[in-house]
């Protein structure tokens, strides 16, 4: 099929966190007034995609997430994720022989410094896993290096107040010699939206031992609960007699997902950090991370688990075919339609343009469930009408980001806002003679109440997600998984699917 005979643009709209569940109870997707989605569902070919577990390269039963989802979408194949890879290394003993870890330990033994081991302590498995942190702590401690642990509490990929149980379990598994130094809610330590005032509080506690004090982690957690702040929002707290970082110490960052650990490390590690006046710079003997976090951090730290390179990605194949493409999102999901969709690489392909709309500056998105969807929609419609692009990928962040707040009413509003945007985009696609694929990367806001605890449900789900193919004449689609989206888009564009893409086009005619 020649480029001139294919529909243009082929547009993928990702409704982030918009999963499928038949039961309407506490289901923002079903309770929302979504006339555009409903009409497209009723009048267009549709199916379901699997977004969790082994279908996206995770352990069986592990919920998907935005990073994993976009990696699989962009790769057009199931991508083995860091979680099972690292877990296997910890189980079989190879982690203790990891060359980067051995070099890190040697540097600290030579300097006489402390290993500041930091990360999300949670069984959630989205950004980190506490079992990995336990394994690393035991290895470093057994080598004779003092260890100070900086706990980031979850409450987002886990129930909002579940930290007391699994942090308690984590503490019992650590060697007696380990110091528990600080406790910070991920709202502060793992911000990714350049809210430097949040990050600064975590930095002051971790680096300088400044901030509220508590005798131990569980006391700090209980005090936070007493002030009606769940795990995610624990104010960065200094524990026991922790006195801060000193020259010759080292950092071992245990998050394997990059997007929410980068900012904290930027402040602590980068010698030329200028986003705010962050105070003193510690001269670290070594800095090591679980994975590659960014190009600008890479010169200053080693990596335990380098990414397995991916070739022939969706964006790469489209560029090599001489086609144009556009990636669009607001701040919260911009890395996903760029960095993660491009295989975890900070590369911009020939003919690839990008549009970033700033996310609103609010404490939590239930306060503004519309987020920046209206502005993003304006730019999407203009891009479609421009006729410049063969492929457009757009992410609406609202269902996921508002779903994480646990507010059902706000999540309903988020879904309704996105549907309004989808309506305008659909109209523009029809006028342009294009094709529209609508789907999600994982579930979230279709389950807003925890069926076990009865409390708010703020994490992702294992549910399938819908996929709709609109305005592709004569085509029908079948069920699949996220890895099948890239082959589908290439088929719609008349571009040959490379052998490296092992996903299967959803088109029945393919």
Swiss-Prot record:
PANTHER family: 2,3-BISPHOSPHOGLYCERATE-INDEPENDENT PHOSPHOGLYCERATE MUTASE
Cofactor (UniProt): Mn(2+)
Similarity remark: Belongs to the BPG-independent phosphoglycerate mutase family.
InterPro entries per record: Alkaline_phosphatase_core_sf, BPG-indep_PGM_N, Metalloenzyme, PGAM_B_sf, Pgm_bpd_ind
Alphabetized GO MF terms: manganese ion binding; phosphoglycerate mutase activity
Oligomeric form and interacting partners: Monomer.
Organism: Gluconobacter oxydans (strain 621H) (Gluconobacter suboxydans)
Binding, Mn(2+) 2: 16, 66, 441-442
Catalytic-site annotation from UniProt: 66 (phosphoserine intermediate)
Gene that this polypeptide is encoded by: gpmI
Pfam families (UniProt xref): iPGM_N, Metalloenzyme
Binding-site list for Mn(2+) 1: 400, 404, 460
Name used for this protein in its record: 2,3-bisphosphoglycerate-independent phosphoglycerate mutase
Cofactor: how and how many bound: Binds 2 manganese ions per subunit.
Reaction it catalyzes: (2R)-2-phosphoglycerate = (2R)-3-phosphoglycerate
UniProtKB keywords: Glycolysis, Isomerase, Manganese, Metal-binding
EC identifiers of the protein: 5.4.2.12
Metabolic or biological pathway: Carbohydrate degradation; glycolysis; pyruvate from D-glyceraldehyde 3-phosphate: step 3/5
Functional description taken from the UniProt entry: Catalyzes the interconversion of 2-phosphoglycerate and 3-phosphoglycerate.
GO CC term, one of those recorded: cytoplasm
Positions that bind substrate: 127, 156-157, 186, 192, 257-260, 333
Gene3D superfamilies associated with the record: Alkaline Phosphatase, subunit A (3.40.720.10), BPG-independent phosphoglycerate mutase, domain B (3.40.1450.10)
Key word Metal-binding present: yes
Signal peptide positions on this chain: none
HAMAP family: GpmI (MF_01038)
Any single biological process term in GO: glycolytic process
């Amino acid at each position: 099929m020649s480029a001139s005979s294919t529909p243009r643009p082929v547009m993928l709209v990702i409704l982030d966190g918009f999963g499928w569940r038949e039961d309407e109870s506490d289901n923002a997707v079903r309770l929302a007034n979504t006339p555009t989605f409903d009409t497209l569902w009723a009048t267009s070919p549709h199916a379901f995609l699997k977004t969790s577990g082994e279908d996206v390269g995770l352990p069986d039963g592990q919920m998907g997430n935005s990073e994993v989802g976009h990696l699989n979408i962009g790769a057009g194949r199931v991508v083995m994720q860091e979680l099972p890879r690292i877990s296997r290394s910890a189980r079989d003993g190879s982690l203790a022989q990891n060359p980067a870890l051995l070099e890190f330990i040697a540097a600290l033994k030579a300097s006489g410094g402390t290993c500041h081991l930091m990360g999300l302590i949670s069984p959630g498995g989205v950004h980190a896993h506490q079992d990995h942190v336990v394994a690393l702590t035991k290895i470093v401690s057994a080598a004779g290096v003092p260890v100070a642990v900086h706990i980031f509490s979850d409450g987002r990929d886990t129930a909002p107040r579940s930290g007391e149980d699994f942090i308690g379990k984590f503490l019992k598994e650590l060697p007696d010699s380990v110091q528990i130094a600080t406790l910070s809610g991920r709202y502060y330590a793992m911000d990714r939206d350049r809210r430097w005032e949040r990050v600064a509080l975590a930095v002051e506690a971790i680096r300088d031992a400044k901030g509220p004090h508590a005798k131990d982690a569980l006391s700090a957690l209980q005090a936070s609960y007493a002030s009606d702040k769940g795990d995610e929002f624990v104010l960065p707290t200094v524990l026991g007699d922790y006195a801060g970082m000193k020259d010759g110490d080292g950092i071992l960052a245990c998050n394997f997902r990059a997007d929410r650990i980068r900012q904290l490390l930027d402040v602590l590690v980068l010698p030329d950090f200028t986003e705010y006046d962050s105070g003193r710079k510690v001269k670290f003997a070594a800095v090591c991370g679980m994975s590659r976090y960014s190009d600008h951090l890479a010169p200053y730290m080693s990596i335990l688990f380098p990414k397995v390179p991916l070739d022939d990605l969706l964006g790469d194949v489209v560029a090599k075919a001489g086609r144009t493409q556009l990636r669009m999102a607001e701040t919260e999901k911009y890395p996903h339609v760029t960095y993660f969709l491009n295989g975890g690489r900070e590369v911009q392909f020939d003919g690839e343009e990008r549009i970033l709309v700033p996310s609103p500056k609010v404490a939590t998105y239930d306060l503004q469930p519309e987020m920046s969807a209206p502005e993003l929609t304006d730019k999407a419609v203009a891009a479609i009408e421009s006729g410049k692009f063969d492929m457009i990928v757009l992410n609406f962040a609202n269902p996921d980001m508002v779903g994480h707040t646990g507010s059902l009413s706000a999540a309903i509003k988020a879904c309704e806002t996105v549907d309004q945007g989808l309506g305008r985009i659909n109209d523009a696609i029809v006028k342009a003679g294009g094709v529209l694929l609508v789907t999600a990367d994982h579930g979230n806001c279709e389950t807003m109440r925890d069926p076990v605890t009865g409390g708010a449900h703020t994490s992702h789900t294992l549910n399938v997600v819908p996929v709709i193919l609109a305005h592709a004449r004569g085509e029908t689609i079948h069920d699949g998984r996220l890895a099948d989206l890239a082959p589908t888009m290439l088929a719609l564009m008349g571009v040959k699917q490379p052998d490296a893409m092992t996903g299967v086009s959803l088109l029945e005619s393919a």
